[in-house]
Design a protein with these regions (language model features):
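Internal catalytic-core helix/loop-beta-alpha segment
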Residues: 137-185
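Short Gly/Thr/Asp-enriched flexible loops that form oxyanion-binding sites at enzyme active sites
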Residues: 197-207
């Protein structure tokens, strides 16, 4: 292939695949452990070891090329350097070995021109991506589950995309799947913790389920947004634990 053909080859990424500046990477925390709150007193009354031994679902949300690869629409948030992908891989591997977890890889696309839309949705979705002018190939690449998680995906795992604003409880068959499999324990990882994770955790509680959030396997758009979100989730909706604690519990 000549140099000219390389230069004119269509780009597969929605944005230019440019690495983040070293100056920005240098200020990103390698992990968000410091943002994780102490477990709320009421959750301390639970036997999490027993709860995590029940039929359970491991649910990763939004962990795509968009977030972790140069050229992705959300790559500029720096998640590739903030440790949540590594914590997800470690947690998912332990859950797989435990043998009692179903796996669901939930996609969250920012490109929503074909989604059913209210007037609110229309203007909000347009603000995310309309100026990018991405091709379908670029959109498909952006939405693809990141390679590190594809490597631990297995036949029988469920993959789906959210079609509501920020919840898979509306517009997908996952709630029905969980009900039919008698699964009530849900373990969440992914982005964004103050958006899809918190929204689905709240919905899970309202639907009689038992959500648990692996905090360092999640991330907000900006690191400084995480502590308040984790504190709110932990106080009101679900235990927020570290990947180290999760791995320890499911390996016992």
């Amino acid at each position: 292939m000549t140099q000219t053909s390389v230069l004119t080859q269509p780009r597969t990424t929605p944005l230019e695949p440019t690495e983040l500046p070293e100056s920005f990477r240098a200020i990103l925390p390698a992990t968000n452990h410091a943002a994780l709150p102490p477990m709320a007193d009421h959750w301390k009354q639970l036997d999490l070891l027993e709860i995590l031994s029940r039929p359970a679902a491991f649910i990763s949300i939004g962990q795509s090329n968009s977030v972790y690869r140069p050229g992705g629409v959300q790559y500029g948030e720096g998640h590739a350097f903030r440790g949540n992908l590594e914590a997800t891989v470690r947690s998912a591997t332990a859950a797989r070995a435990a043998g009692n977890f179903d796996f669901t890889w939930v996609g969250y696309s920012l490109f929503r021109s074909q989604y059913p839309q209210t007037d609110f949705d229309r203007v909000q979705y347009a603000s995310w991506t309309d100026e990018i002018g991405a091709t379908q190939e670029q959109i498909d690449w952006d939405n693809t589950l990141v390679e590190e998680l594809q490597a631990i995906r297995e036949p029988g795992d469920k993959e789906l995309f959210e079609t509501a604003l920020q919840s898979w409880f509306v517009g997908t068959d996952l709630p029905g799947t969980l009900a039919r499999k008698r699964i009530e324990v849900l373990v969440f990882t992914g982005v964004h913790v103050d958006w899809c994770i918190e929204g689905n955790v709240r919905a899970a509680r309202d639907n009689g389920l038992l959500p648990i959030v692996i905090g360092d396997a999640c991330g907000a758009q900006r690191p400084e947004q995480e502590a308040a979100t984790f504190d709110r989730i932990n106080r009101f909706f679900a235990p927020v634990i570290s990947s180290d604690l999760f791995v320890d519990l499911v390996r016992r």
